[in-house]
């Protein structure tokens, strides 16, 4: 399984100034539960915003720079990350360039919708989801955060595939 996961504002924003501009502990717990034991693929800016490897998961950072930290593996591309991950479950966790490149590989896209309107000079927008390629599931309430909604988009498969 290869999945993309992110939270998005009503304006389609996923980040401001290299950071996630909201904090919902229940959504962080859900993220941890879903991604635990899998391989995470992220860009360098996303890694720097987190500040450390996420425990219980393999952390692959797509970067042209070497990051010398225990628990981090540097790769040059999404394709190299997927080759390193092998048959493991993979979650693409940001940023925008990683999401765009991951679209051609993803089996599903797990989106949390936050009600927060945000602004800033350095905004990052969510990737466009092609509903010709991804079937939208139902809009569901978040299990732990009443203000949030979530939806999983599943890749449409060709007939006979």
Model region roles, listed by residue range:
Residues 1-161:
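Enzymes that bind and transform nitrogen-containing heteroaromatic metabolites
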């Amino acid at each position: 399984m290869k999945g993309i996961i992110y939270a998005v504002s009503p304006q389609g924003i996923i980040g401001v100034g290299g950071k996630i501009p909201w904090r919902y502990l229940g959504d962080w717990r859900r993220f941890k539960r879903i991604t635990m034991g899998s391989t995470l693929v992220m860009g360098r800016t996303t890694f720097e915003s987190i500040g450390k490897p996420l425990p219980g998961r393999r952390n692959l950072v797509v970067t042209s720079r070497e990051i010398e930290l225990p628990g981090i593996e540097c790769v040059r591309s999404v394709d190299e990350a997927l080759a390193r991950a092998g048959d493991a479950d993979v979650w693409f966790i940001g940023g925008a360039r990683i999401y765009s490149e991951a679209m051609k590989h993803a089996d599903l896209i797990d989106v949390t919708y936050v009600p927060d309107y945000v602004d800033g000079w350095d905004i990052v927008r969510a990737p466009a989801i092609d509903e010709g390629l991804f079937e939208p599931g139902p809009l569901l309430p978040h299990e732990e955060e009443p203000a949030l909604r979530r939806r999983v988009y599943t890749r449409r498969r060709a007939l006979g595939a």
